[in-house]
Structures are given as structure tokens and as C-alpha cells.
């Protein structure tokens, strides 16, 4: 039994009121010198037909020893309680040792779903220090939510789509000297850097890259195979880092996963009359919320990160019906 429960039980024994209600009325004093817990006796003034200071003094005189409480003091209309620090430390350590890894767990979440997105690495690029804060904080939140009784869903929203993969394919086909599965991510990065160096001298290479990405979009077997190999290689390498960090995910659905889901989002926005066109770009006007507009389609018809993010949020809500 915790201190608040013991205090509430002691007051209940003197007043005949419900301990649960009394516990809810307990407060934390603004100054530690005033105690660790404070009971506002004005709550009892109507029932006991006495002034709060008189009630506080009466309770202080009638309540005996309370386990975990060193002393109590009537102060104005409050009855202040001072915790027995030695007993508190001993009891806490006993609970920690007894509960082990489950210490602090609760059923607060009631099994409800919570989505936590973290790490979100880029394919064909190494895991670096910039990914570490999101990965560590996100995984901590994931574990905390699980301990609180939620069904946490860890999501690694991969950066696995875009013309950069067309560039990667061009670079690999020109200068790659072994099968992709035998490469390292750093070797892929070197090829990618070389592409940009060569493209400055030969701009037509950018057209090749766009053509290869178009092949990925259209499902060309060779293009999709290479793209998938880049993805598999990256996840294999970064998986070793995640294992060392004790990080896990339930979903690796990234940008590519939402490519075929953005059309429905755009249609829904249009049907609801939320889209406007400004200088060729299609956007949602958010001026009523004192926010800049959210661009959904560029003037050339291309989607943006915001478009994918909307598709991801809607998909996750429909799939997981998350509460957070």
C-alpha cells in the first residue's frame, strides 16, 4: 500500500468517508518544507460542520501512527504529512527488486493502439549520428507505452522512394563491379557521389536517372529488382545497429508503400472542397489557423512529402485506429 492510500485510510477511519474519495483530495504542498502530502480540510467543513483549521487540529490529534509517515502537522486549514524517507527508500527498492523488469508497469493503456514513428532511415545511405536521437527517443517511448499497457506499434518510415534511386541505378550499372548483395552501403554511397560528380560534366545522366526511376514506378523487373536489393542491403546493415541498440519495429512501411494511396487522399480533399490552386500548385489554405498553406501537388503535378504524410496518417488511422 502506498503512502497516499495509507493516509486516506487513516482519515477515513476518523470521518467515515470513502478512502478512495479522500485519496483523490490529497494534494502536494507547494513547498517541501510544508510536507510531502497535504489534505485540504475545507473538503470536510460541510460534513463535519466545523471550520477547516479546527478539523485539521482534530484529525492531527486523533490519527495515530501511519506506516511510511514520519509526522503530521495541522497548518491552517490543511493537515500536512511528512513521509518517512528511510522507509520510502526501503519500500521502493523492495518493490523494484521484487517486480524486476515489470516495475512501473500498468494497464493505463487498456490495450489501445499507439503509433510511434522513429529512426526513419534513408535507403542506400548509412545509419549516422543524426538518426540516433530519433531512434533512441522513439524506442524509449515505444517501450514506455508498452509498459503502460498500450499496444505500441513501432514504425520505421523508410526514405525509399524518389529520383535518387534512378541515379543509384545509373551509377551502379556504370561503375558497380559486383552484385548488390555483396556490396556495402558505403560503397553504394561512393557510387552515388560519383554520379553527381559526373553529372555536372554530363547533364544528360540526369535524364537517364529519371528514366530509370520511371521504370521503377512502372514495375520494370530489372529496375524494381535493383531497387529492392538496395533496400534489402540497407536494412540488413542497419539491422545490426538496431540489434546492438535493442531497437525494434513492427512496420517498415515507408514512402514507396504510400505511392498508390495518395490519389485517394487527393480525391477526398477535392471532394470536401479543401483544395485551391495558386500559381499552378494545388494546396490546402490554412490561413484560418494562422499557418502557411500545405502544398499537395506542385505545378508539374508531382506529389510532396506532405502528400505522403497525409496518406500515411490516414492509412495508420484506418489500420490501427490509434489513440495517440
Predicted regions and their residues:
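Generic start-of-chain signal for non-secretory N-termini
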Residues: 1-18
Amino acid at each position: 500500500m502506498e503512502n497516499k492510500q495509507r493516509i486516506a485510510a487513516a482519515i477515513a477511519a476518523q470521518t467515515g468517508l470513502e478512502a478512495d474519495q479522500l485519496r483523490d483530495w490529497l494534494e502536494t504542498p507547494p513547498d517541501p518544507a510544508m510536507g510531502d502530502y497535504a489534505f485540504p480540510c475545507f473538503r470536510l467543513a460541510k460534513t463535519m460542520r466545523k471550520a477547516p483549521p479546527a478539523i485539521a487540529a482534530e484529525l492531527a490529534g486523533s490519527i495515530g501512527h501511519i506506516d511510511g509517515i514520519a509526522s503530521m502537522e495541522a497548518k491552517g486549514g490543511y493537515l500536512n504529512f511528512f513521509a518517512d524517507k528511510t522507509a520510502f527508500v526501503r519500500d521502493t527498492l523492495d518493490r523494484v527488486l521484487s517486480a524486476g523488469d515489470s516495475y512501473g508497469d500498468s494497464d493505463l493503456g487498456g490495450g489501445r493502439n499507439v503509433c510511434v514513428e522513429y529512426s526513419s532511415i534513408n535507403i542506400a545511405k548509412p545509419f549516422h549520428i543524426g538518426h540516433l536521437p530519433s531512434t533512441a527517443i522513439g524506442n524509449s517511448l515505444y517501450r514506455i507505452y508498452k509498459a503502460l499497457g498500450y499496444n505500441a506499434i513501432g514504425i520505421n518510415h523508410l526514405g525509399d522512394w524518389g529520383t535518387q534511386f534512378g541515379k543509384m541505378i545509373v551509377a551502379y550499372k556504370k561503375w558497380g563491379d559486383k552484385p548488390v548483395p555483396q556490396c556495402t552501403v558505403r560503397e553504394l554511397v561512393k557510387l552515388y557521389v560519383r554520379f553527381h560528380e559526373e553529372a555536372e560534366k554530363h547533364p544528360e545522366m540526369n535524364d537517364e536517372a529519371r528514366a530509370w526511376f520511371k521504370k521503377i514506378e512502372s514495375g520494370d523487373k530489372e529496375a524494381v529488382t535493383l531497387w529492392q536489393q538496395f533496400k534489402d542491403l540497407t536494412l540488413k546493415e542497419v539491422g545490426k545497429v538496431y540489434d546492438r541498440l535493442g531497437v525494434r519495429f513492427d512496420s517498415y512501411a515507408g514512402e514507396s508503400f504510400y505511392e498508390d494511396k495518395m490519389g485517394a487522399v487527393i480525391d477526398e480533399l477535392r471532394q470536401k472542397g479543401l483544395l485551391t490552386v495558386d500559381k499552378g500548385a494545388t494546396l490546402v489554405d490554412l490561413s484560418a489557423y494562422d499557418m502557411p498553406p500545405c502544398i499537395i501537388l506542385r505545378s508539374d503535378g508531382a506529389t510532396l512529402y506532405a502528400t505522403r504524410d497525409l496518406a500515411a496518417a490516414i492509412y495508420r488511422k484506418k489500420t490501427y485506429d490509434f489513440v495517440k
